[in-house]
Curated annotation (Swiss-Prot):
The keyword Ribonucleoprotein does not apply. Its main location: membrane. This is Putative membrane protein insertion efficiency factor. It comes from Nostoc sp. (strain PCC 7120 / SAG 25.82 / UTEX 2576). Could be involved in insertion of integral membrane proteins into the membrane. Belongs to the UPF0161 family. The lineage of its organism: Bacteria, Bacillati, Cyanobacteriota, Cyanophyceae, Nostocales.
Amino acid sequence: MKQIFIWLIKGYRMFISPLYPPTCRFRPTCSMYAIEAIERFGVFRGGWMAIRRILRCHPFHPGGYDPVPELGEHCCHHDSGNKG
């Protein structure tokens, strides 16, 4: 299942993305981020991370360097405040 989603993203990069000017505000690009997140975390968690990233890719966000977190790193921006 993971390979199907990666294949679809690569198809987008090859056939659809070249039709439009580059507009991604992040490095790595959102499509590369999606591929890496799915490879590292699987379809559901990696896909969710990719969707959140794409939703941040707009003119009002500064963008910049935003790599896929390593396994074990805090990746989903949950509140990790002290509970005590």
